[in-house]
Amino acid sequence: CNLSCPYCHREGELNPAKEISLEKIEEIIKNAKSIGIKKIKITGGEPLVREDIADVIDIIKKYNFEDISLVTNGFLLDKYAFELKGAGLNRVNIGCDSLSSNILLKTAENIKNGLRAAKEAGLTPIKLNMVVLKGINDKEIKKMIEFARENDAVLQLIELINTDDEFYKEHYFNLKEIEKELEKKAIIVIKKDMHNRRQYDLGDVMIEIVRPFTKDFCENCTRLRVTSDGRIKPCLMRNDNLIDFKDKCSLIEAINEKGVLYVQAN
């Protein structure tokens, strides 16, 4: 990644050191399609620092998934948005933790340029990911809702994941009270299948709450992750049960493992 945000969970990888080959990506994608996986999300790290990212998307596109999305910090999105759309990318999530200059390594200008490019390229609906941090950006939630409204974007308010005990203790912000306020204001509350997440439709903007350390999150998790070296990761929070990819049976094993993980956690 071209940033080093102190709260980043790195998709659960402690020491990512490799970059998966295009050949391995296609092998995994082909087998994922064969067992009924419908959606692919590309994340990182920062996917756009990979020089062949458009080739990665082009490979995925060949297999006709319902949705191909990408999570980015937005720094390079202005440069690559149209190329990514041409390769087959449907939409993007942009990290947008603050609109204050340099509060979290990014400037408002970086975010706005990436957002503008994504809109012009048709990478929509755009989601803005805001990790809410006590004492850093928790006073900006209303401002961010307005920003999402102005830009026809969905705002995801995300609770901090504990990757550093000291940082977590100082900056964890519980979103329960915010969620109560949204429930009062919402025209419609939508419950999504994935993670049992709730979306609050305020009429002219949609707000989604993401709370990673909850029973609902684990019980309704429908994701498998692929690590940077091509192994299958059934759970974001664990690294002791990675599965080496060999064929579609590896993916099926990982899916079965998710059920075991949930029982153990509860």
Q: What feature does the model see in each segment?
A:
Residues 1-7, 26, 30-43, 217, ...:
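N-terminal pre-triad scaffold of radical SAM enzymes
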